[in-house]
């Protein structure tokens, strides 16, 4: 049985470009919005709590862009041509895709846009979620 990703995928694809925000056109009516996150240092993890979060340690990150919103089903459909989500709702986050499907999505997204998207690292995700240093947008 294939492993299914049940968490929502935030289009946290990251790539290096200049500017504060960017709109990525997927087709005439569907867009991705990405926001600039100024790099910096922060403490990742914790010395208390869950074992897999230990130990707390300092991380240094370069500037990056990250998706402003979770990837919607309509954005997925615009790139892939189908919807993997069990409960259709085009404005809702896409879910229930396999890791392989997600990697195929990124590959196709890169071809469609001519950019180099990827998933963020754990550190990039946590830093952005905490507001980074000077997150714009």
Predicted regions and their residues:
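Chymotrypsin/trypsin-fold serine protease catalytic domain
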Residues: 136-137
């Amino acid at each position: 049985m294939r492993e299914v990703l049940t968490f929502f995928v935030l289009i946290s694809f990251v790539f290096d470009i200049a500017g504060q925000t960017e709109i990525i056109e997927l087709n005439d009516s569907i867009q991705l919005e990405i926001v600039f996150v100024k790099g910096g240092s922060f403490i990742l993890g914790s010395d208390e709590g869950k074992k897999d979060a230990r130990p707390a340690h300092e991380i240094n990150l370069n500037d990056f862009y990250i998706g402003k919103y979770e990837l919607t089903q309509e954005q997925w459909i615009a790139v892939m041509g189908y919807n993997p989500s069990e409960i259709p709702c085009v404005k809702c986050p896409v879910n229930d895709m396999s890791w392989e499907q997600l990697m195929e999505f990124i590959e196709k997204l890169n071809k469609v846009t001519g950019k180099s998207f990827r998933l963020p690292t754990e550190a990039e995700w946590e830093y952005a979620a905490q507001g980074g240093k000077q997150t714009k947008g």
